């Protein structure tokens, strides 16, 4: 079953490239696409725009939105102070997630995805919307999960890993081989 609204999480560096590779294989049924990324992440925004411009050449009525949220944790920020910035990011994310009411969240990588996924879980707890959360752990994670992965392993509907060692350690995960 394909739903009308899809939400994609985008991240800096290689995470953006990984998620865009996944999206390149999706049909036009996954439209509109709502990208959510850190408000300070200009590089991902540029990559998304380029990706969507190329996609529009194939799918003429391709629709997408760009949405920014506060970053949970800046590089070199202390773990103790990141609790407050993460809570702020969750509070900021909930109205956005409520407005979009996505059917699916496809996410990978750094902590920016955690507030959006928590917001989606709140929608379900409040009986407003069941959002399917698909987390794809980065290809770079060979033996251990990222912090986001360790958190979302318990809350995602589908948790995909790209290395057999991770499947052995995390039995709920789905191993599909290298998918990005």
Residue ranges of predicted features:
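Nucleotide-activated sugar donor-binding and catalytic core shared by glycosyltransferases
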Residues: 1-180
